[in-house]
Amino acid sequence: MRLPTPAIRRGALAILVAAVIVVGIGLPASAQRRWVVAFANLTEEPGVTLEGTGFTGPEVRESFTLAARPYPIDLVLYDNRRDDARAAANAEAAIARRVDLYVQYHHGGTANATVGQKLKAAGIPALAINDPVPGAPLYALDNAGAGRVAGEALAQFAARAWSGQSTVAVVIGRVSAAAERVPERVRGVTGALRERLPGARLTTLDTHGNPAQVAPLLGAFLSANPSRKVLIAATDDATALAAKTAVETVGRALDAAIVGQGVDRTIHGGINDRKEIDPANRNSIVIGSVAFYLDRLGYEVLPLALRMLRGEAVPSRTLTPHKLITAANVFIEYPPYDMN
C-alpha cells in the first residue's frame, strides 16, 4: 500500500484540527464541565427584611436562581434561618453532597468560623456574603459608602435649589440597628453633609424600626424648624415614604427633600405598582434612593464563584457598587420590563 505524501498528511492533519475546533466550539452546554454550587441564604422567612432595607430572603434566593441560568452551575439551596445550628447543619449537608463551592450568607462570627473550618477540612472553597468566613473571599454591602452617596445627593440638592437659605438636616429610621450596620450608613450620611454643608445643623431620629414613629418624630422636628429648609436622609425606603407623607401632611412639601436607602419595590414599584421614583413623577420630594441591589445579589456573587472554581484569583473583599437612583435613571437600572 502506498503511503500518502507529506503534503497530503499535513493537509489531513489540518482538516482534523479544524474539525476538532469546530466541534469544541459547538459543544452543547450539557457537555461542558458543570459545577455544583451551594447557596445558604440568611433566611427564607416571609416578611423578614434584610440588612436594614426592604428586601427579603426570597428575593435574594430568586436572584441566585435566575443568575445561575446562563452559567454551567447546578445550584443547591439552603436556608440558614438566622440560626447558628442550622447554618452548621447546612454546611455539613453540602459537604456530604460534595458540592464544588459553598456560598455562605449568615450573621454570626462563631457559626461562620465553624462553617469555614468544616469546609476547609473537606476541601471545599467558600465565598461569604456580608459577614466574613475565615479564609473566604467576602462580598459585602458598603453601608458607609451608601450613606455618603445619600448625604452628597442631599447636599447637592440644597446647593442647587436652596442656595443661601437656612437649612437643617435629619437622619431618620432605625439609626441604632447595629446588627444590620445601619449606624455605618448614618455615619456616611452625616460625614458627607458635614463636609458639603458645614453650616447645617444635623439631627438623628431613631424610629427603632417602627414606621408609625416617623410622623410624630418628624412632625416635632418640622415644628421646631418652621422657617428652615429640611434635608431628610431616611435609612430605608419605607421610612422615606413615611417621611414624605408626614411632610406633606403638615404642608411642608416645598421645604423638604428626601433620600432613601435600598431601592426596593416599595419605592420603584413593580410593573403594576405605584412608583415613587419614576420618570413621570419628577416633582416628588423623594429625590432618590441609594441602590443596594439585594434583589440582584446572585448576579454579583455567582461570577465571583465561577472565577474561583476555574482557579482564577478574586479580590479578598468586593463591595456593592451603590448608586443613587432617581427619576432620571431608574429605567436604566430597573427597566420597566424588569419590574416584575
Set out the residue ranges of the language-model regions.
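Short, solvent-exposed amphipathic alpha-helices that sit
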Residues: 51-70, 146-150, 180-200, 213, ...
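Short beta-strand elements at the ligand-binding edges of bilobed clamshell
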Residues: 79, 132-156, 172-176, 276-295
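Hinge/cleft segment of the Venus flytrap/periplasmic-binding protein
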Residues: 13, 33-35, 173, 193, ...
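Flexible loop/hinge segments that line or gate small-molecule binding clefts
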Residues: 110-145, 265-277
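Extracytoplasmic "Venus flytrap"
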Residues: 34-68, 76-88, 106-109, 138, ...
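Hydrophobic alpha-helical
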Residues: 101-120, 189, 203-272
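Bacterial N-terminal signal peptides
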Residues: 14-24
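Hydrophobic alpha-helical segments within soluble ligand-binding/sensing domains
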Residues: 139-168, 184, 214-215, 264-270, ...
